């Protein structure tokens, strides 16, 4: 009761509105290559920040609950400069190409962050899935999705099957919003 009284008597006259809050955990844009301008425009148009540098397990393992010691701990490697354009082309064509940036419902389907990483997998030796498989597309992050290819896939060139898999995963958000808004019946 005393605590309530002392808190309620504090002078709040100096409290004003917050002008701007920056939730970005990364430097953005992440460079000054041609694709960085494209990524910056995507952030302005869509509200989705594409991140490809300095993504580590602390970012990949943010979640709503506290994990058990046997849960996966996601790890990755940073894509090369040559890889970034491959990732970005897929994002532009298959994810953003199926959405309408003038529709707020479409923008709401996208994550705050899209991590472009190589070799995403489970790095927890206590986990049942430890280094057993590569994770191509992860959509269950707290505020992010991640798109990943293995270094070998990128070096050999993406096969039509791999591109098809990404296209199918990326088409889901646009289909979902079209059905929810009854644009598709």
Label each PLM-derived region with a short phrase.
Residues 9-98:
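Acidic/polar, low-complexity intrinsically disordered N-terminal segments immediately downstream
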Residues 76, 80, 100-106, 155-162:
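General structural signal for secondary-structure boundaries
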Residues 4-8:
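C-terminal motif of bacterial Sec signal peptides marking the signal peptidase cleavage site
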Residues 63-69, 117-119, 146-150:
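Short loop/turn segments at strand-loop or loop-helix junctions that form parts
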Residues 46-47, 58-62, 108-113, 140-145:
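Generic structural motif recognizing short loop/turn segments at the entrances and edges of beta-strands
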Residues 143-185:
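Active-site recognition of the HExxH zinc-binding catalytic motif
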Residues 83-142:
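Auxiliary, metal-adjacent structural segments of Zn-dependent hydrolase domains
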